[in-house]
Each structure stands twice: as C-alpha cells, then as structure tokens.
Amino acid sequence: MRENAKSFYKILSKEAKMSCVKVFLTMCLFVAVALGQELTGDDIVKKVNDLINVETAYMKAKMTITTTSGAKRTFTYESWSKDRGAKTLMRYIAPPRVKGQAILMLNNANDIWMYFPRTGRVRKLATHAKKQKMMDSDFSYEDMGSGDTFIDDFTAKRLKDDKYEGEKCYKVELTKKPDSDISYSRLIMWVRKKDFVPVLIEYYDENNPEILIKRLYQKDIRIIDGIPTAFKIIMKSEIENSSTEIELIDVKYDIQISDDMFTERSLKK
C-alpha cells in the first residue's frame, strides 16, 4: 500500500509539474498572440473613421464663435449627412439675419454650394474654398464635410500610448499623403481606448509640419443609438486665439434621407 501511495504521489507530482508547464506555455502563447494582434495606427484610425462616419445622420446644433477680441456670435443650424459624410446639407435656423441660409457639400466638400435667402440665389464656391473658414468660424468647410478624410488623405503611425483627462488613449500621428490636397500636413490624435472616440486632435500647418495651428476637443460623450457621441465639440485656434464651440441639441443616426435632399434645388426649401 505504502509503495502504491508513494508511486501515486510521484505520478501526481509529475502531472502537476506538467500541468504548470502547460499553463505557462499557454500563457506565453496568449501573450505572443496578443502582441501579434496589437493595433496598428491604421487599425485605430479605421475604427475612429467607422465610429464618426455613420451611413446617415441628422443633427441640430448651436455654434458659438468667440473672436480674438472676445466678441461672441451664435448660430443654430440643422444638418443632414449621407454616404458616411460624403454628402452634407446644413441649414441655418437662427438668428433671423441668417435664417434659411444653406450650405451643400458633396464629394467630401470638394463641391460646395451656398444659398442666400435674401437674394434667392445659389452660388457655387471655387474648389479651394473648402480650405476657408465656414461662417468665419474656426472650422473649415472640409472639417465639416470631408467624410473619410482620416483614411483617404493620411497615413497613420501609432505613437506611445498616453492619457488625456485621466482616460487611457491611443496616440496616433496622421501624415498627409503626397497626392492629397487636404489643408493639414499632419494630425496628432488622442483616441480613447474604451470606445475609440478621438477626444483631442492637433492640426499642423499645411506647409510647415512643426507649426500647430488649432486643436479640436470632444467632450460630454453620450451614447446615442449605440454610438458614442460628443455633445460638445470645441475648435481652438492657436494662431488667432479664437475658438468655436458646437453644442448638439438633437442627433439621430441611420435614418431615411432621400438623395433629393442633396441637390441645388433642395437648398431653397
């Protein structure tokens, strides 16, 4: 009996040792696989792009512009977008002096039309106008209607992970592609790990990648239709010391929007 017991414990000891070795090897394999699946800069930016560019969206928002002198101007507008932001229609509803004014952006803001209710005329802007300020804000037309720009116009490189306002973030550098006409030489983006919301984006000068020209902040993140949505978006100019804040009043995703809305005729409605 004693010999059998000793043999049993010896066998058990060997099996226990083997079990430990197997567990250790499994853990090593898991770590290796995890490292092999580490997200690249392109992976992160694709997730960001998929998050912010839904198929269709409606928004009502208030835009407050603070000029260099500290003066403030406020507009309220509605916007409709389709095809992942490639088509965007914006219509101002307040104050009275701009009520009815509308902006149509197609082909990722490469084609822009504006409607002025006082004259009843529709005017097509020159192609380079997409780089200009929209309604004298700190947002350009291409900022507001450029769809898949993070993927189409930039290459991505993952930098060292960082924190922003206590949140763990991926940090990614986006560098302008040689054939792109986007207004920025590069972007630095802080992306929350938990939901891939880009909470901070730095924009650098088109001709000098060392000159920071403005920063975008996304705050008050709420879940709407399963999508993390920033209800407060702030663009601050580092050159002019001005800022523009967009506060969402209402937002709806994946709604039915007719293609007829994105036509010159619809601007006058």
Where are these regions (language model features)?
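Bacterial N-terminal signal peptides that target proteins for export
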Residues: 8-25
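N-terminal mature ectodomain segment of secretory-pathway/periplasmic proteins
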Residues: 39-118
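A short, amphipathic edge element
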Residues: 42, 71-73, 145-157, 212-215
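Surface-exposed, polar helix/loop patches in the mature regions of secreted/periplasmic/lumenal proteins
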Residues: 102-152
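Short, conserved active-site entrance elements at the starts or edges of catalytic domains
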Residues: 137-175
